[in-house]
């Protein structure tokens, strides 16, 4: 029985492990809050460079002072500041006037800043253009309602036109047949009348020839 008694203290061991897991969760949540709460380093650097009025540009030491004044931990995030400067220079948002790498002085690229402002203005213009387009859709519905009226009026007109055209065709065909038959008969009759006149003229020309021959015969005797 004495051997079974020491087995009981094994139960509090897992109880001690559970708070360790809770602490790990808390630290992870706190780290997430820290990351979400502060803006990225690149934004802070661009703001600090834009706020400076130096023509030659802002040095790294001046940047660190401006970031420390804004509440950013410069000592812990020194490497992040240098990486942020390099990335901004590679993107074209910052121009390095002096030095190489992260050490030197930096200025804002005016062309990149103006390029970022232009697309925003275009988006605003597109949003304004969309509003009148939506207002113009309302009168289109009214025109669509008016179209069936026009089609209803056109259908009886189409039915009347073929009937009138058929009547006109029938009327025009009947006088053409009457006119074509009359001149043909009239043309044939004068042709027949001219033929006997030509036959009558031929014997008249032959008669004087016979008389002349008879008169000449007694002279030969």
Swiss-Prot record:
Q: Which GO terms describe its biological process?
A: chromatin organization; negative regulation of transcription by RNA polymerase II; nucleosome assembly; regulation of transcription by RNA polymerase II
| Comp. bias (Low complexity) | 1-17
Q: Which residues carry this modification: N6-acetyllysine?
A: 17
Cell compartment(s), UniProt:
Nucleus; Chromosome
User: Where the protein is mainly located, per its record?
Assistant: nucleus
What UniProt keywords apply to this chain's record, in alphabetical order? Acetylation, Chromosome, Citrullination, DNA-binding, Hydroxylation, Nucleus, Phosphoprotein
Query: Which positions bear N-acetylserine?
Result: 2
H15 domain location: 37-110
> Where is the region Disordered?
1-42, 92-221
Where composition is biased (Basic residues), the residues are 20-36, 120-141, 150-161, 170-187, 194-221
Instruction: Give Gene Ontology CC terms.
Output: euchromatin; nucleosome; nucleus
Q: Which residues carry this modification: N6-(beta-hydroxybutyryl)lysine?
A: 33, 35, 53, 65, 86, 91, 107, 141
PTM per Swiss-Prot/TrEMBL: H1 histones are progressively phosphorylated during the cell cycle, becoming maximally phosphorylated during late G2 phase and M phase, and being dephosphorylated sharply thereafter. Hydroxybutyrylation of histones is induced by starvation.
* Function of the protein: Histone H1 protein binds to linker DNA between nucleosomes forming the macromolecular structure known as the chromatin fiber. Histones H1 are necessary for the condensation of nucleosome chains into higher-order structured fibers. Also acts as a regulator of individual gene transcription through chromatin remodeling, nucleosome spacing and DNA methylation.
Annotated domain remarks: The C-terminal domain is required for high-affinity binding to chromatin.
The entry's protein name is Histone H1.3
Could you tell me which species this protein originates from?
Answer: Mus musculus (Mouse)
Gene this protein is translated from = H1-3
